Design a protein with these regions (language model features):
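Short aromatic-hydrophobic micro-motifs that form the base-stacking/packing surface
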Residues: 180
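Active-site-proximal, substrate-binding regions of enzyme catalytic domains
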Residues: 2-177, 187-280
Length: 280
């Protein structure tokens, strides 16, 4: 195990999921805009080479199943709807793709490949191994966190446990890791953090639920990684360097007095008056 600090950001399904109720493209697959926003933060802070993004296998599987189920529902609704209306200007035809689940699974795999080609390192966080089975069962039967809450009777609690156990098993091999777990589930947050810290005192985890919280921690990481080049998100582009130079007291002096090495200034003019009217 390396002693070098590692930085990891893990996503929960409820952060990345797409809504398929009012508008949807069932030809493609992608995470929602939140994923892009967080990746943009890593790029703006220039820490994309140090911070890795982990997508649990549970998340991939769950989101794939979500689009399959949404497609099955919407295609039936659409078929029923178009039977009620006929227009001479429009003709609706069907395409036989035989098996939508297999079709979309191949689309998901291509999306994974696209992410892997990007600047940011994207890793799939494996399901917990057989060695974690006993822990998973104990949580299930005893309703220990992250089981419980309003949805304790659904399979959601079980999926939450799989993700959490995946993170714990991952940290066993990365004991110096600094981890962000981005999830909309706020229940048992303190309990889970306490469990994590007792198991891995050299590692750290922040369980966060909002983009502004992610931004704050990523900025802290960026400052820790390189204090001298650290630039908070949003400040880098606040000031236009050209505008700053034009508005500085030295602008006129530098513009007039600059010697381009062509003709001595003294041979051209004895006195110069310069007034800046406007600039774009």
């Amino acid at each position: 195990m390396s002693n070098e600090k590692e930085y990891w950001l893990f996503f929960d399904t409820n952060v990345l999921f797409q809504l398929y109720d009012k508008k949807a493209d069932f030809n493609s697959f992608s995470f929602n805009s939140t994923f892009e926003n967080v990746c943009d933060m890593l790029s703006q802070l220039d820490i994309y080479e140090r911070v890795s993004v982990g997508i649990p296998k549970v998340v991939w599987n769950e989101m794939t199943q979500q689009i399959i189920e949404a497609h099955a529902t919407r295609v039936l609704e659409f078929g029923s709807y178009i039977k009620k209306w006929k227009f001479p200007e429009y003709r609706v035809t069907t395409c036989d793709i035989e098996d939508y689940p297999n079709y979309i699974k191949s689309v998901v795999e291509r999306y994974k490949e696209e992410l892997e080609k990007g600047l940011i390192k994207i890793t799939e966080l494996s399901l917990p191994s057989a060695s974690r089975f006993q822990s998973v069962m104990e949580r299930a039967f005893s309703k220990l966190p992250p089981f419980g809450g309003k949805e304790k009777n659904s399979d959601k609690g079980f999926k939450d446990v799989l993700i959490w156990e995946s993170i714990l098993e991952f940290t066993a091999q990365h004991e110096n890791a600094n981890i962000i777990f981005y999830t909309k589930d706020k229940g048992y947050k303190d309990v889970l953090v306490d469990e994590f810290e007792k198991l891995y005192p050299n590692a750290s985890i922040a369980i966060l639920s909002a983009e502004n919280e992610i931004k704050t921690v990523l900025e802290e990481w960026a400052k820790s990684i390189d204090e001298y080049s650290y630039q908070p998100i949003g400040e880098e582009n606040d000031v236009d360097p050209f505008a700053e130079w034009v508005e500085s007291p030295n602008f006129v002096v530098q513009l007039i007095d600059h010697d381009y090495g062509l003709i001595p200034q003294s041979a051209l003019v004895a006195e110069t008056i310069f007034k800046l009217v406007d600039y774009e």
